[in-house]
UniProtKB/Swiss-Prot annotation:
The lineage of its organism: Eukaryota, Metazoa, Chordata, Craniata, Vertebrata. GO terms for molecular function: piRNA binding; RNA endonuclease activity. Keywords: Cytoplasm, Developmental protein, Differentiation, Meiosis, Methylation, Nucleus, RNA-binding, RNA-mediated gene silencing, Spermatogenesis, Translation regulation. The gene is PIWIL4. It comes from the Eukaryota. This is Piwi-like protein 4. The keyword Coiled coil does not apply.
């Protein structure tokens, strides 16, 4: 099937004149309209080209990708859907006060800055109509902005909706303009709404304003963030470039309008798509090249450095070459080769390369068909890192060394950004035109909750480092361990010696932990994935408790085929270890300890506990991600504790296709988890606290309207008597605010256990931040918690302290993790299924942490 046919098959309609090979009506570059206060005549701030005259000479815009007011400044409109959700007013116990009081107070500085504006500031929303109607959004904007009534006003316009910070004299204003063709266009501007500064629409406008401001600082928007290509950091040994930049946001925090910014980096490969395709062809051969190439490239994001724009590769058109022609807006035809020579003085060297196809998002209020951009692989640079690259330790170390910032370094970068905005004449003018001014950087008071004691079988340890008790795990007996009597080790001839050496170390380490490990049956296999699976099929019987595979390489097919068979087809706990990992003799004790911990858990063992004051409490972790092979399939991982000590778990993973289906499967899971709890405890839990991770922007409403009712329904149906009390907490590891302590005129990471529940939180939500990890180098990130439903009525102090306790119970690491253990377990489960298994694991493994 040709690229043209595939595009049609995927529902991307071509224009009528695009049926001939090489003739497409769509431009190679997207159209653009900037939301500046003089879009019709000025440059976009970083390309130096006129929107109307210069670009129209070629019939092609070289400016910003044409997204609308609602889309362009706010890359995803869903970002602001959550702002209209108010959950706190329904929670009586925190309606008046949601802050805790226990713990040691600590002064913190943040990456949040006050934005000052007049008390009577309002935003005026108008609707603009044109008679006769105009299809061109750019022409609509140009005609409207040519009038003196709007020339000196701060404004944002998407072709239909106009926002002004100053009210027009009349509710209905009528204007007229004449086009270059002499046609008279009548425009009617009608006032629709007067919006207070707290309106979600105003928040969108504020964010668009600051995105315009960063463009005035010669920064480029890629995705949601802005980057500075003039200050690249090179990693030549790995052919990578890093563009420094910022993620920014404007929002209300506890009734204050605040500007937040954090440092960001864009990873760019110094490798063109053509170079990638050439290398791939050499590896795979011509027979399966096109299929492999499409599989690896479609869906990736590329950067065209001649205009610093990013595009998604939606297809590859093998029938179109750079020597083919396309039709410009003025009706003339030009070859791609000649176009790039004329427009950018770029000479295309390979005239036989295929063309990449990118679907340009259809503009809001634009009635034209969705357009396709044809891009030349030779001029497109790959962005991001491949899975192979992320597994390259040396590469990731080199990237980390460039991007890791100390708290003081991060603070300096943020201070410089704010200073640049205030010093830049155009940026400052943009702010002042809208009536905005930068205020002070926010300082606040947090609290440090007490550290936890780790409960072992015959020992209570207070770790020297509160975040790590790895030394204690080697010398103390774990809570409970099942003996490993019948098990298999699969290895090749080449790795047999290292297997024997490792086995001796493993048995010594496990013995000191109280985990009895007998000698296994060692089976030698050939070094290919199919041989491992055949050996498993041959030797695994009902008595085998665990299968260990020592893999000769990190080739993904080894791990995937073994895990898929032993998780679904023949459910037996499995342990995969790379042979090269076992060759690190100086680290053998540490490696053996970690593997012994994992094996214990996979057999149903319990490693340690913390004191849980609440009796009869079930905690649940839920995570959702997309399947790596089928992007329309969502993998839902659910993990629930089944004993009061919160050391035993019930895990299940379900594959679904819609968010409604996700809500439905949560009821199925909760029913199974409650049955399991009843089986072990002969009663239902008095309290259930659900930690919901994997929540995207704009999904709070779905959680509240669909998921919470399903959870409540399963709880209510489980007992005819009194039902368990339920709380649901949304967990987000990625959040904009950062916190620092000031010591000796410098800033440092806050202490472990720091809680922030004021000033940087939302007034309409019951929320808090918790720092439950230690950053030896770099800057620590807080985790954000939003309690969206709460029947338990716990005091904020108790909810925060319980959450901190749960961060100690992740058995894959003898230390504290950044999220509660059930969340991390659910993440590990979904990752295994989404990346390797691609089907639901057998319920026979549900009582074990088989995915560690």
């Amino acid at each position: 099937m040709s690229g043209r046919a595939r595009v049609k098959a995927r529902g991307i309609a071509r224009s009528p004149s695009a049926t001939e090979v090489g003739r497409i009506q769509a431009s190679p570059l997207p159209r653009s309209v900037d939301l500046s206060n003089n879009e019709a005549s000025s440059s976009n701030g970083f390309l130096g080209t006129s929107r109307i005259s210069t670009n129209d000479k070629y019939g092609i815009s070289s400016g910003d990708a044409g997204s609308t007011f609602m889309e362009r400044g706010v890359k995803n409109k869903q970002d602001f859907m959550d702002l209209s959700i108010c959950t706190r007013e329904k929670l009586a116990h925190v309606r008046n006060c949601k802050t805790g009081s226990s713990g040691i107070p600590v002064k913190l500085v943040t990456n949040l800055f006050n934005l000052d504006f007049p008390q009577d500031w309002q935003l005026y929303q108008y609707h603009v109509t044109y008679i006769p109607d105009l299809a061109s959004r750019r022409l609509r904007i140009a005609l409207l902005y040519s009038h003196s009534e709007l020339s000196n006003k701060a404004k944002a316009f998407d072709g239909a909706i106009l926002f002004l910070s100053q009210k027009l004299e009349e509710k209905v204003t009528e204007l007229s303009s004449e086009t270059q063709r002499g046609e008279t266009i009548k425009m009617t501007i009608t006032l629709k709404r007067e919006l207070p500064s707290s309106s979600p629409v105003c928040i969108q406008v504020f964010n668009i304003i600051f995105r315009k401001i960063l463009k005035k600082l010669s920064m480029y928007q890629i995705g949601r963030n802005f980057y500075n290509p003039s200050e690249p950091m090179e990693i030549p040994q790995h052919k990578l470039s890093l563009w420094p930049g910022f993620a920014i946001s404007v929002s209300y925090f506890e009734r204050k309008l605040l500007f937040s910014a954090d440092v960001s980096y864009k990873v760019l490969r110094n490798e063109t798509v053509l170079e990638f395709m050439t290398a791939l062809c050499q590896r795979t051969g011509l027979s399966c090249f096109t299929q492999t190439c499409e599989k690896q490239l479609i869906g990736l994001i590329v950067l065209t450095r001649y205009n610093n724009r990013t595009y998604s590769i939606d297809d590859i058109d093998w029938s179109v070459k750079p020597t083919h022609t396309f039709q410009k807006r003025d009706g003339t035809e030009i070859t791609y080769v000649d176009y790039y020579k004329q427009q950018y003085d770029i000479t295309v060297s390979d005239l036989n390369q295929p063309m990449l196809v990118s679907l340009l998002k259809k503009k809001r209020n634009d009635n034209s068909e969705a357009q396709l951009a044809h891009l030349i692989p030779e001029l497109c640079f790959l962005t991001g890192l491949t899975d192979q690259a992320t597994s390259d330790f040396q590469l990731m170390k080199a990237v980390a060394e460039k991007t890791r910032l100390s708290p003081s370094g991060r603070q300096q970068r943020l201070a410089r950004l704010v200073d640049n905005i205030q010093r830049n004449t155009n940026a400052r003018f943009e702010l002042e035109t809208w009536g905005l001014h930068f205020g002070s950087q926010i300082s606040l008071t947090g609290r440090i909750v007490p550290s936890e004691k780790i409960l072992m079988q015959d020992h209570i340890c207070q770790p020297v480092s509160a975040a790590d008790w790895s030394k204690d795990i080697r010398t103390c007996k774990i809570l409970n361990a099942q003996s490993l009597n019948t098990w298999l080790i699969l290895c090749s001839d080449r790795t047999e010696y290292v297997a024997e050496s490792f086995l001796n170390c493993l048995r010594r380490v496990a013995g000191s932990m109280g985990f009895n490990v007998d000698y296994p049956k060692i089976i030698k296999v050939q070094e290919n994935p199919a041989a491992f699976v055949r050996a498993i099929q041959q030797y695994v019987d009902p008595d085998v408790q665990l299968v260990m595979c020592i893999l000769p390489s990190n080739q993904k097919t080894y791990y995937d085929s073994i895990k898929k068979y032993l998780s679904s087809d023949c459910p037996v706990p499995s342990q995969c270890v790379l042979a090269r990992t076992l060759n690190k003799q100086g680290m053998m004790m540490s490696i053996a300890t970690k593997i012994a911990m994992q094996m214990t858990c996979k057999l149903g063992g319990e490693l340690w506990a913390v004191e849980i004051p609440l009796k009869s409490l079930m905690v649940v972790g839920i995570d959702v991600c997309k399947d790596a092979l089928s992007k329309d399939v969502m993998v839902v991982g659910c993990v629930a504790s089944v004993n009061p000590r919160i050391t035993r778990w019930f895990s299940r993973c379900i594959l679904q296709r819609t968010m409604t289906d996700v809500a439905d499967c949560l009821k199925v899971f909760m029913t199974g988890a409650l049955n399991k709890w009843y089986k072990y405890n002969h009663d239902l839990p008095a309290r259930i606290i659900v930690y919901r991770a994997g929540v995207g922007d704009g999904q709070l409403k779905t959680l509240i309207e669909y998921e919470v009712p399903q959870l409540l329904s399963s709880v209510a149906e489980s007992s005819s008597n009194t039902s368990s009390r339920l709380s649901v907490i949304v967990v987000r590891k990625k959040c904009m605010p950062r916190f620092f302590t000031e010591m000796n005129r410098t800033v440092q990471n806050p202490p472990l256990g720091t809680v922030v529940d004021s000033e940087a939180t939302r007034n309409e939500w019951y929320d808090f931040y918790l720092i439950s990890q230690v950053a030896c180098r770099g800057t620590v990130s807080p985790t954000y918690y939003n309690v969206i439903y709460d029947d338990n009525g716990l005091k904020p102090d108790h909810m925060q302290r319980l959450t901190f306790k749960l961060c100690h119970l992740y058995y894959n690491w003898p230390g504290i993790v950044s999220v509660p253990a059930p969340c991390q377990y659910a993440h590990k489960l979904t990752f295994l299924v989404a990346q390797s298994i691609h089907k639901e694991p057998s319920l026979e493994l549900a009582n074990h942490l088989f995915y560690l």
